[in-house]
């Protein structure tokens, strides 16, 4: 049985999700700090697949790590990284069973 190819996030998609998330949370300090840092993080799952034997959770983990480590947004970096990781998993048919509030709380370091 063949598996579906992984759908990777685009730069434009991440920007839209970041802005929508920050507005929904009532944040006023958000936006792009460095586009190259976003694109670098978005490339990590592709590299993990090309140069290793990364399954979907491993690709998601490297995406999340890259987004948090790179700190590419003005604000909301951990929340956006957690949200985008969840989105990445969902668009590829994998759902996290934790409540969204628990995911955000865990992802924001609280």
What are these regions (language model features)?
Residues 1-110:
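FIC/Doc superfamily catalytic core
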């Amino acid at each position: 049985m063949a598996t579906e190819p992984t759908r990777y996030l685009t730069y434009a998609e991440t920007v839209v999700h970041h802005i929508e998330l920050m507005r929904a949370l009532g944040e006023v300090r958000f936006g792009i700090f460095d586009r190259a840092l976003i694109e670098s993080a978005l490339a990590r799952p592709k590299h993990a697949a090309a140069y290793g034997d990364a399954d979907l959770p491993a690709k998601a983990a490297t995406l999340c790590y890259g987004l948090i480590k790179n700190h590419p947004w003005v604000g909301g970096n951990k929340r956006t990284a957690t949200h985008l990781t969840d989105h990445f998993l969902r668009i590829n048919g994998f759902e996290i069973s934790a409540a969204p509030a628990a995911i955000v709380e865990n992802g924001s370091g609280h």
